[in-house]
């Protein structure tokens, strides 16, 4: 027997029919729409972050030497670029697998594999973002203890573009975090049915 609190929690996440009663098809449609929207946003954020990072260059002359900083000079930035490309490709592929889930007879194992995919993409994104954030912090503030000087006061445009690319990657991460929450909710609701 379901408790009143349990029933109200289920209703909170379900859409209601015109008569006020929740329907499975409306709830299913809203979940699929949320999945597609979040995946589309993740694609948009990652595909935008890639060219922003690739085009980040600012030639500067230091002590008579011409230097052009680029993402290629930082393994963390190359890693983030690779992560963004990977997440973009796998998210585009995952859109093909979300569409069949709209049927009410979908097997729970399909949701599990999609959730597993979402977890791997989330972990990739947060690791790439963390690496880029560490390098960005050192570029902005330096580390006096090890005599690393900040460079962002010299190459402001380059640092600004790297920041934009990293922020876009973080936005893709938050999309995947929301996808994970949706997946867990779906798996939990199926387990209690």
UniProtKB/Swiss-Prot annotation:
Per the record, what ranges lie on the membrane's Cytoplasmic side? 1-35, 100-118, 183-193
How does the record classify its membrane topology? Multi-pass membrane protein
Q: Which GO terms describe its cellular component?
A: plasma membrane
What residues form the membrane-spanning segments?
36-56, 79-99, 119-139, 162-182
Query: Where's it found, cell-wise?
Result: Cell membrane
User: What are the start and end residues of every segment in region (Disordered)?
Assistant: 1-25
Membrane topology, Extracellular segments: 57-78, 140-161
UniProt keyword list: Cell membrane, Membrane, Transmembrane, Transmembrane helix
Q: Which InterPro entries match?
A: CASP/CASPL, CASP_dom
Annotated family: Belongs to the Casparian strip membrane proteins (CASP) family.
Quaternary state and interactors: Homodimer and heterodimers.
Which NCBIfam families does this UniProt record tie to the protein?
Answer: A_tha_TIGR01569
Name the UniProt record assigns to this protein = CASP-like protein 1F3
Q: What is the lineage of its organism?
A: Eukaryota, Viridiplantae, Streptophyta, Embryophyta, Tracheophyta
């Amino acid at each position: 027997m379901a408790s009143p609190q349990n029933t109200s929690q289920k209703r909170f996440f379900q859409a209601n029919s015109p008569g006020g009663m929740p329907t499975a098809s409306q709830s299913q449609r809203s979940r699929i729409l949320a999945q597609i929207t979040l995946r589309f946003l993740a694609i948009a954020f990652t595909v935008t972050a890639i060219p922003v990072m690739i085009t980040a260059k600012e030639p500067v002359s230091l002590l008579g030497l011409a230097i052009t900083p680029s993402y290629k000079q930082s393994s963390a930035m190359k890693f983030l670029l690779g992560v963004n490309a990977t997440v973009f490709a796998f998210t585009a592929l995952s859109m093909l697998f979300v569409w069949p889930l709209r049927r009410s007879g979908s097997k729970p194992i399909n949701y599990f594999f999609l959730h597993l995919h979402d977890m791997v993409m989330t972990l990739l994104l947060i690791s790439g973002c963390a690496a880029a954030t560490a390098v960005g912090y050192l570029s902005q503030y330096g580390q006096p203890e090890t005599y690393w000087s900040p460079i962002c006061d010299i190459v402001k445009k380059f640092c600004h573009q790297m920041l934009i690319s990293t922020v876009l990657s973080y936005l893709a991460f938050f999309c995947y975090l929301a996808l994970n929450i949706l997946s867990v909710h779906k798996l939990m609701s199926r387990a209690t049915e």
